[in-house]
Each structure stands twice: as C-alpha cells, then as structure tokens.
Amino acid sequence: MNPKVPMTLEGAQQLKEELKRRKTTDRKRIIAAIEEARAHGDLSENAEYHAAKEQQSFNEGRIAKLEGMLASAEVIDTSRLNSSRIVFGAKVTVIDEDTEEESTYHIVGDEEADLEKGKISISSPMARGMIGKEAGDSIEVRAPGGTRHFEVVEITF
C-alpha cells in the first residue's frame, strides 16, 4: 500500500480539474484527431496520425499519474489550521539575514510545488528548516548552494 502524501485542498482541486479536462475535452479532441488522420489513408507514413497517437499516449499516461496522485493524497484543508508554529500548509514570510530580502513561501505537497508561485515542497531543505519554527525564530537552511540564514517574520494559513 502506498503511503499517504500530504496535499492542500487547493492542490487536490487543481489536480481533479486537470483530470476531468483530460478525460473529457482532451481525450475527445485527440480521438477526433486520430479519426481525421486515419481518413487520410496510409498510416505508415501519416505524420498526423503518429502525432495524434503520441498525444493520446501522453494524455493517458498523465491521467494514470493524476489518478495515482489523488488516490495516495492525504488532503489537508489548511483554512482550518491555526498554529503559531510552521506546519504543512503554512504561508511563511521570511527575511534573508544576509541580503535583508523578504520572501513568502507556501509549504505544500511535493506534487504542488512551484517555486515561481512561492510554493515549496514539504520535503525541500527550506521547508524542512522551517517546520516547527515560530515568528521571530531564525532558520538555518543547508542547501547545495551553501548554508543560508532566515528570520521568520509572519505565519499565516
């Protein structure tokens, strides 16, 4: 049995929406493209047919992956959390003690992580350094690029 993987309610909803779209809209579009390409005759040299079959393979693989992720997800409604300590689902504002630069990170599940959107994986060095800390605490993060020091400014959910 696969261990449960933490996931925010928002992340689970996004995966469900993608799964629904892939099973309905995308699947129908790809099947129509295959049918159209088949109508062009000889399949051995039909680039449109092979491209559509490749799309179908990718789409079905992604559907299987999404179903697996959702089946193993332990969905956590972070809006119900209220803690003075940093836990999964927290939005944490920190200041880099070296550069004085302020950043906000949302601690999410591995599948939801997106650094460009400020979402970091619960298993990342940054999140592991944050868990259990409170506002005002210092954090030491050991990463491949070296050790960094941050101060926790604010924790919200």
From Swiss-Prot:
This is Transcription elongation factor GreA. The keyword Endoplasmic reticulum does not apply. Keywords: Coiled coil, DNA-binding, Transcription, Transcription regulation. One of its GO terms (biological process) is DNA-templated transcription elongation. Belongs to the GreA/GreB family. Necessary for efficient RNA polymerase transcription elongation past template-encoded arresting sites. The arresting sites in DNA have the property of trapping a certain fraction of elongating RNA polymerases that pass through, resulting in locked ternary complexes. Cleavage of the nascent transcript by cleavage factors such as GreA or GreB allows the resumption of elongation from the new 3'terminus. GreA releases sequences of 2 to 3 nucleotides. Signal peptide: none annotated. InterPro entries: GreA/GreB_C_sf, TF_GreA/GreB_CS, Tscrpt_elong_fac_GreA, Tscrpt_elong_fac_GreA/B, Tscrpt_elong_fac_GreA/B_C, Tscrpt_elong_fac_GreA/B_fam, Tscrpt_elong_fac_GreA/B_N, Tscrpt_elong_fac_GreA/B_N_sf. Residues 9-30 form a coiled coil. GO terms for molecular function: DNA binding; RNA polymerase binding.
